[in-house]
């Protein structure tokens, strides 16, 4: 299901991106798996935080997403960096002129869908970044999340594919300007329909602009699959 990119949601995410250093830290985890001088596709890039963070580690990044709003936001933030190409549309219908050296699917799409696209568009490494937890973090109830690490491993084993795997955790909490902002945030992201926002989860924020903070330590799993090995399977 395509994410609904509202101005309010994008504003919250930009605040988190600016304060947490999540995407630069994630890019450092991904970098050792990239071929030298790689052309990398960030599939389902959203606001492009990871796309921009990957630029120091490769020759070029192509950021692809279906939604227009986050891509326009990315273009405004990134300017005219010649190392970055932004493309709007269905990744399945946007093959590159020359196959990518690596493709990153970060919390986006199922394994079989990602591998189908990668077989057609990539000649090197497919990197799947998956949640390593079962329930949605910003909901008051227990709401399952999709595309988990366990599900992805099961699929790769079923397909008979070899892969490299790395588990780690990164902080990606939400800085908040006021308690009213916190209430708005929970109304936007609480998928359990809880009536009362769990304000007790807030801690002191990083500074005067953001006096409140909602911690969120994300357990993640990186799964790396090589296209040549897929062709032999």
Language-model region placement:
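Conserved class I S-adenosyl-L-methionine
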Residues: 1-34
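Conserved SAM-binding loop of SAM-dependent methyltransferases across substrates and taxa
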Residues: 47-57
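Conserved SAM/SAH-binding beta-strand->alpha-helix loop
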Residues: 67-69
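Conserved SAM-binding loop
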Residues: 74-75
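Conserved SAM-binding strand-loop segment of SAM-dependent methyltransferases
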Residues: 80-91
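Conserved beta-strand signature within the Rossmann-like core of class I S-adenosyl-L-methionine
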Residues: 123-136
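Conserved Class I S-adenosyl-L-methionine
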Residues: 167-233
């Amino acid at each position: 299901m395509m994410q609904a990119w509202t101005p309010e949601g994008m504003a919250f995410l930009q605040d988190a991106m600016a304060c947490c250093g999540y995407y630069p830290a994630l890019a450092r985890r991904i970098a050792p798996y990239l071929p030298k001088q790689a052309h990398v596709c960030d599939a389902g890039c959203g606001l492009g935080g990871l796309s921009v963070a990957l630029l120091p580690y490769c020759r070029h990044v192509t950021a692809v997403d279906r939604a227009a709003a986050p891509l326009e936001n990315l273009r405004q933030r990134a300017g005219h960096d010649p190392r970055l190409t932004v493309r709007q549309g269905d990744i399945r219908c946007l093959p590159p002129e020359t196959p990518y050296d690596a493709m990153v699917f970060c919390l986006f799409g199922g394994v079989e869908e990602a591998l189908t696209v990668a077989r057609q568009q990539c000649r090197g490494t497919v990197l799947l970044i998956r949640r390593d937890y079962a329930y949605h973090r910003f909901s008051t109830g227990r709401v399952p999340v999709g595309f988990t690490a366990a599900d992805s491993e099961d699929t790769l084993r079923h397909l008979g594919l070899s892969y490299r795997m790395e588990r780690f955790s990164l902080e990606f909490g939400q800085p908040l300007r006021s308690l009213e902002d916190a209430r708005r945030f929970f109304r936007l992201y609480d998928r359990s329909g809880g009536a009362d926002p769990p304000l007790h989860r807030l801690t002191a924020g990083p500074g005067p602009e953001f006096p409140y903070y909602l911690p969120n330590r994300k357990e993640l799993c990186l799964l790396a699959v090589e296209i040549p090995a897929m062709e032999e399977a």
